[in-house]
């Protein structure tokens, strides 16, 4: 059966384990899930191709619902500055920070951006990721933001991984432009972006001294008018009330939430906005983690994502996310699986297509190199994915 909504609170623990069944796939869809004898009685399987997963655990493909996949250049040296004790402002003054990525992304050709992001997608696919949300936000001008979105569009056509596109010009305020002027320019360009790109979502970095709550309200309301679904980088550094605000906007997800307030937790529990947690970023920045247990125990729907980006979390590692979620945020492995599958599907408006092994859904699934999904956390930090099936085709097979 189709899961028609995300799993909230204690329901995140229920993953619907099935033993001794086989999955029948026709074209790119799941046709049936049943014991072999039932399938043989109902279907002619003489010509069926068999993928033997005997003794292995099979899960839905993972969905990485928050990434900054496309950027130019790299900032490896900056990480060493951070380790030596420099704060963000010092790094900015040395030519690092988001401004460095903006400069390099503006300078990069579309082909260079495609080549770099394609390699990242290859890495993600090997770890069982079959759908990725990808944001713009390293252009901070119409030309480069659109270039990033077109890269996402082209990658979606050439790569096995499905991509979901998010317009995020409101990621930072570009040098030499006043905030009000920049906000007005973003709003003026919304119609053009909607018309000329495949961007489905609009996202804002809602933070003190960047886009405050009033700025965010103005931007999200304008984006909604133009038909964008909404996301928000909310309550990461300072509790501005972003979570409770985006629930009133019926946003698809509120992401980060390290500093979410009690009112924010309550609003997320009562609404349908997914709370997307990004433990890799907290780990990389050596900050406290988002309050996963508090959110779950209050009845929220949690997703987990990598936040892959060139600065605060240069990692697409799903094994790392799983380890941090379980060991640093006290989530169970079942809750983590829910957060990387069905709830992550909800976070990209794909609940009816992907996120669970169900009849009629897209045949996106992964086979682990172990009989139990417990291997995902038991074999710490190691990729347990042996085979990836995307739209009914084997797109990755580990040969050891």
Residue ranges and their predicted role:
Residues 1-42, 373-375:
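N-terminal metal-binding scaffold of metallo-dependent hydrolase/deaminase domains
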Residues 101-116, 122, 130-241:
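Metal-coordinating catalytic core of metallo-dependent amide/deamination hydrolases
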Residues 225-230, 248-249, 286-370:
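His/Asp/Glu-enriched, well-ordered alpha-helical/loop segment
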Residues 23, 28, 55, 66, ...:
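Divalent metal-coordination and catalytic microenvironments
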Residues 47-52, 165, 388:
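Conserved beta-strand scaffold positions in the cores of enzyme catalytic domains, especially
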Residues 6-14, 340-342, 359-400:
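C-terminal cap of metal-dependent C-N hydrolases
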Residues 182-197, 211-297, 313-315:
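Catalytic core of soluble alpha/beta enzymes
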Residues 48-116:
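Metal-associated gating/positioning segment near the N- to mid-region
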